[in-house]
């Protein structure tokens, strides 16, 4: 890790404070710079779906990554192993499967599917398909723009 764990906790606290002000319960952050800021994860794996989830009531963020990329998260982040979630290679280039379908299931399993969810709507790596998968898969959630949070 480039910084002490406390530095990441301080950053997380600032982000949660901004989330609270915007009425966001769950942040889905896809921007590689923001993922790094929150967790220390800095691998060049952003060419395919990945994100960090920040829930207002959780102590740590969750890294959601492709299976072949989680090794970097174990090394570069301060996160507990349980907060590094991998998706299977079956979601890679196998239309109609997509990693965000699995992400939606994770959100439902944690009972966050009725939350106010912040999305980085202007993030280069957040595609229209990712958005539609979340919107369709979580019909009871309120989706908000969390850009420049």
Question: Predicted segments — roles?
Answer:
Residues 1-149:
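A composition/biophysics-driven feature that prefers long, compositionally simple stretches
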